[in-house]
From Swiss-Prot:
It comes from Drosophila yakuba. SMART domains: WD40 (SM00320). Coiled coil: none annotated. This is Eukaryotic translation initiation factor 3 subunit I. Component of the eukaryotic translation initiation factor 3 (eIF-3) complex. The eIF-3 complex interacts with pix.
Length: 322
């Protein structure tokens, strides 16, 4: 149980090796934890608003965060200093490094008369001059705003999930949409996470389902149904398992008891689409989930402001579906 945030968690992420766990929340200060024993290593102090998203690069050297103070910041992971702060015209909802770590993408909200836009920046030699530089690519979103984002294979495409349930793939060289999923989801997409090999990804949606999609064709492969909005979903790196987390909207939380089981982490079989386990823990909806890269534990961040790291026992690995 990691206690270091004063307000609800918005996103959590492991680095590639899994020794560090990053968390951000609405309290303006992203944290980094040592995942093995839950020791807090430090905070990244500099944002003036709720931090909505974060990502760490392949080498665990840079961290990118996006916040409601209308900035995207790039940090030095080890020293906690701001390398660059990029101003935007509305709050930043998603941010991700590419696999190579040479580029980063972020998207802004449709708010205050501004349309939602997707930006691409070159972060190879990132320094304070990045705030004055023009982004390498800028794509306005005419229809629905972006609520989650992933990099596609080989850093050639970006996959975006939208507020109306659409998923699209953008070719970053041409700067245009190449694939559109249509209406597999009937409500907004809260989260998208890739499988370990990048061939597929799982979505979490307000329409009470999580779905598995092919990363290139956006073909819907599997669907995992629940009774309430899904806020986050993650794919196990070693087993055919998916974990979903959710609950109702934050404003309805006080009207239900925790016994109703609405705030559990729910485990589904990736292929058979069957739920086989639930884990309790949070006193409110789960906002973000992440599997440890070795697949032996997972972390969840909730509306209650806690991050919980849960390690699986041996029976979890023996639970083979017949």
């Amino acid at each position: 149980m990691l206690q270091g945030h004063e307000r609800s968690i918005t996103q959590i992420k492991y680095n590639r090796e899994g020794d560090l766990l990053f968390s951000c929340s609405k309290d303006q200060k992203p944290n980094v934890w040592y995942s093995l024993n839950g020791e807090r290593l430090g905070t990244y102090d500099g944002h003036q608003g709720a931090v909505w998203c974060l990502d760490v690069d392949w080498e665990s050297r840079k961290l990118i965060t996006g916040a409601g103070d209308m900035t995207t910041k790039i940090w030095d992971v080890e020293y906690g200093t701001v390398i660059a702060s990029i101003p935007t015209k509305s709050s930043v909802r998603t941010s991700n490094f590419s696999f190579s770590g040479n580029q980063a993408a972020y998207s802004t909200d449709k708010a205050m008369g501004q349309s939602c836009e997707l930006f691409l920046i070159d972060v190879r030699n990132a320094d304070s001059s990045l705030s004055e530089q023009e982004p390498t690519l800028r794509i306005p979103m005419t229809e629905s705003k972006i609520t989650s984002m992933l990099w596609g294979p080989l850093d050639e495409t970006i996959i975006t999930g939208h507020d109306n349930g659409n998923i699209a793939i953008w070719d970053i060289r041409k700067g245009q949409k190449v694939v559109d999923s249509g209406t597999d989801h009937s409500a907004g997409i809260n989260d998208m996470q890739l499988s370990k090999d990048g061939t597929m990804f799982v979505t979490a949606s307000k329409d009470t389902t999580a779905k598995l999609f092919d990363s290139e064709s956006l073909m819907c492969l599997k669907s995992y149904k629940t009774e309430r909005p899904v806020n986050s979903a993650a794919i196990s790196p070693i087993l055919d398992h998916v974990v979903l987390g959710g609950g109702q909207d934050a404003m309805e939380v006080t009207t239900t008891s925790t016994k109703a089981g609405k705030f559990d982490s729910r485990f589904f079989h990736l292929i058979y689409e069957e739920e086989f386990a639930r884990l309790k823990g949070h006193f409110g909806p789960i906002n973000s989930l992440a599997f440890h890269p070795d697949g032996k534990s997972y972390a969840s961040g909730g509306e209650d402001g806690f991050v919980r790291v849960q390690t699986f026992d041996s029976t979890y690995f023996e639970n083979i579906f017949e």
